[in-house]
């Protein structure tokens, strides 16, 4: 914004601030294998191996990649622990955090603890954040993983047969805001027709997996991230100035 407004003074100020934040994130937020989520007022970390609940949170890991603020090797390591602790191949969900808030008596994170453990933000799949996990793998150039997890959270793949539909209990054509983790409701969708996830899924699928990006007044570039796995595909571009069909 500062560049667009030709505001040199504030641009320089914020660039210095950015480097200050980056330096101190690496110094104070790295937990040894992943990034911590936050700190309580008394200095107790959240999203740390020290915690009883919420030892790891996906947001700090995915955004270390998306923001380009995290050290690249640390960010890659952090995303490997997202796979280990937050991706559930049995339920086909990507949990927001683990373990859910339910055991610790000391740490009070706020309203999130009001949800039953394994529901919505409290240890279930919060799909907005799950999409950022997909984007993070895409931005790391790990196309096969990005495609795998894109398909994992795609609602059509939670409704392939009658048993799936009875478990998921939502529409196959819209994104669920959340998916439960805890049995006997594991794999059940929560709210639908509600989440900004839809826009992120569209963006990740089109711009990163298919590699279609627009450049103002310069045209388009197509560089698929996972061409072999995707196979042939077709794009149509229709607006007031042009109509293209690209195969």
Question: For each of these PLM feature ranges, what is it?
Answer:
Residues 1-247:
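Acidic, mature catalytic/reactive cores of soluble proteins
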């Amino acid at each position: 914004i500062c560049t667009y407004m030709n505001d040199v003074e504030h641009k320089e100020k914020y660039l210095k601030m950015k480097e200050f934040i980056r330096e101190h994130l690496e110094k104070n937020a790295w937990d040894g294998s992943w990034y911590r989520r936050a700190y309580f007022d008394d200095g107790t970390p959240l999203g740390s191996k020290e915690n009883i609940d919420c030892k790891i949170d996906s947001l700090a890991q995915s955004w270390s990649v998306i923001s380009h603020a995290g050290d690249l090797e640390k960010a890659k390591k952090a995303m490997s622990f997202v796979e280990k602790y937050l991706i559930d191949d049995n339920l086909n969900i990507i949990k927001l955090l683990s373990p859910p808030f339910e055991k610790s008596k000391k740490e009070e994170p706020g309203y999130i603890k009001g949800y039953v453990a394994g529901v919505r933000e409290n240890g279930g799949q919060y799909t907005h954040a799950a999409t950022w996990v997909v984007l993070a793998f895409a931005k790391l150039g790990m196309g096969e993983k990005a495609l795998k997890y894109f398909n994992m959270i795609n609602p059509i793949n939670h409704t392939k047969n009658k048993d799936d539909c009875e478990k998921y209990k939502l529409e196959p054509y819209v994104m669920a805001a959340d998916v439960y983790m805890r049995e006997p409701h594991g794999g059940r969708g929560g709210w639908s027709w509600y989440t900004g996830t839809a826009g992120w899924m569209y963006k990740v699928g089109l711009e990163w997996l298919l590699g279609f990006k627009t450049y103002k007044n310069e045209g388009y570039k197509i560089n698929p991230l996972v061409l072999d796995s995707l196979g042939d595909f077709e794009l149509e571009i229709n607006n007031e100035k042009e109509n293209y069909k690209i195969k």
